[in-house]
Amino acid sequence: MRIGHGYDVHKLVENRKLILGGVDIPYERGLLGHSDADVLLHAISDAILGAIGEGDIGKHFPDTDPAYKGADSIKLLMHVMALAVGKGYAIGNLDATIVAQRPKLAPHIPQMRENIARALKADADRINVKATTTEELGFAGRGEGIAAYTVVLLERK
């Protein structure tokens, strides 16, 4: 059994899509990043990489590499999970929190869970995603960015 923790944050900007958990969410701004900037999937990837002792997503998918420009974070997550499977691990459970003042994310969470479960080859009941605000405090509360925290438990297959 291995435990990993992941955290990521991206700035909200004009003229970008807002993609969280592989879901294109209607909003006037999106997250800035080299890839699709899916902060939730990046935090999940980091948690899994941490659990298997393989560094972080910056090591595996550097933002200096043009190959990852605009990359689909679902595909990056699938690659990370393949590393975990290669070491003999499967998802025990995953718990993630998205921190965003706006937009309201609750209607999109079921699809996020499905996307994540599919990418991780895990049952959806092992995946939990929730969203919270910061009551207008800090960068997330001011609408400057979105953060995500993840804890993952990996079990030997």
Curated annotation (Swiss-Prot):
One of its GO terms (biological process) is isopentenyl diphosphate biosynthetic process, methylerythritol 4-phosphate pathway. Its EC number is 4.6.1.12. 4-CDP-2-C-methyl-D-erythritol 2-phosphate binds at residues 8-10, 34-35, 56-58, 61-65, 132-135, 139, 142. Transmembrane segments: none annotated. Gene3D superfamilies: 2-C-methyl-D-erythritol 2,4-cyclodiphosphate synthase. The keyword Metal-binding applies. A divalent metal cation binds at D8, H10, H42. It catalyses: 4-CDP-2-C-methyl-D-erythritol 2-phosphate = 2-C-methyl-D-erythritol 2,4-cyclic diphosphate + CMP. The record marks H34, T133 as: Transition state stabilizer. Pathway: Isoprenoid biosynthesis; isopentenyl diphosphate biosynthesis via DXP pathway; isopentenyl diphosphate from 1-deoxy-D-xylulose 5-phosphate: step 4/6. Keywords: Isoprene biosynthesis, Lyase, Metal-binding. This is 2-C-methyl-D-erythritol 2,4-cyclodiphosphate synthase.
